[in-house]
Amino acid sequence: MPTVNFAKAEATRRRVLLCMIGESTSGKTYSALLIAWGLAKGLKKDGKPFLMDTENGRGADYADDDVVGGYMYGELTPPFTPERFIEGIGDAEKAGAEVMITDTFSHEWEGLGGIIEIADSAKTKDGGDLSGLVKWSKPKGRHKKLMHFLGRSNMHHILSLRAKDDMEQVDQLDESTGRTKKTIVNKGKKSVQEKRFKFEMTVQLIMEDGEDREGFYKVSKCPKNLRHIFKTGNRISMETGAALADWVNRRKPIDKELEKLRFAGEAAAAKGKEEFFKWWNLKDVKPSWAKLKPFMDNFSSISKTADDDAARKKADEALSVKTEKQEARSKTAPFDPANPAIEE
């Protein structure tokens, strides 16, 4: 039973995750709309981009613009938890979006109710404050689920991120004394998001600052087969999105409904064999059994892993309870040299 089935690689119409990092005067929103319109129209003649706004309604400022107006708009309000971003993205997908802008994705990290606030409010079992790496464990797990969901979305995503100075402490030689001293240097700009966010992106652009440089960018990440579209020093236009659509359209189409079913099957299998077969026997799933059969080995592997993990967790919890009882008894019972061990 193979966990991974290997076959000849095919260039499929993978979803593009485009990240744009910039200051408030870099023109991120307008530039995102230009790309989104070019991409949406290139994918479908009557295509329209969707914009999910977290900036107190500022995303609607271009609603009547002669060039980029007419897009679909929705507002996501606090709390900016990963789960609410997942819900908002899901709502756009259900509404038929092919291309979605999120302005700004930074709020999931540092906005009201975002990951930083979640980590800072983490408590111990006794109600005390957690600190250090421990407090980040569960919040980062929730963030990872959002990124996993984003990577499997059926839409192309343009994510606007706020920028901040990338400051670093370095050793620098003091020529007057011949000694090294600690100095803070500015390495440029970085995004207000989790530090590994870039790894999940197809393309990452750092927007230039200043009204006279709106739309100009520096390429921070771009795969080789898209470098003819994105070049440092270029200015974003609707043609940028159209070129991206052309690249997508030249690749093999994906069966979106089958992919959605496969992802649902994997999610069900991740809850164990029993939950998977409940999903497998749903009346909406049964007609697709033949199409889903090639994925059955993977479903089985995932459900087995889930059941094994659950069994280990149950055993660990039982051992923990037993240990706690033994420790409690050892504190109250008198020490007997002839019988030092206290057993259940």
State where each predicted segment sits.
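Conserved inter-motif catalytic segment of the P-loop NTP-binding fold
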Residues: 23, 43-141
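Amphipathic alpha-helical transducer elements in NTP-driven molecular machines
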Residues: 29, 78-86, 130-152, 186-198
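Conserved catalytic network of the ASCE P-loop NTPase/AAA+ motor domain
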Residues: 11-12, 37-45, 91-95, 149-153, ...
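Acidic surface patches and DE-rich sequence motifs
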Residues: 77, 124, 172-174, 212, ...
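Phosphate-binding/switch region of NTP-binding enzymes
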Residues: 23, 144-239
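Structural motif
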Residues: 19, 99-101, 158-159
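Interfaces that engage single-stranded nucleic acids at replication/repair/recombination sites
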Residues: 1-28, 32-33, 37, 49-50, ...
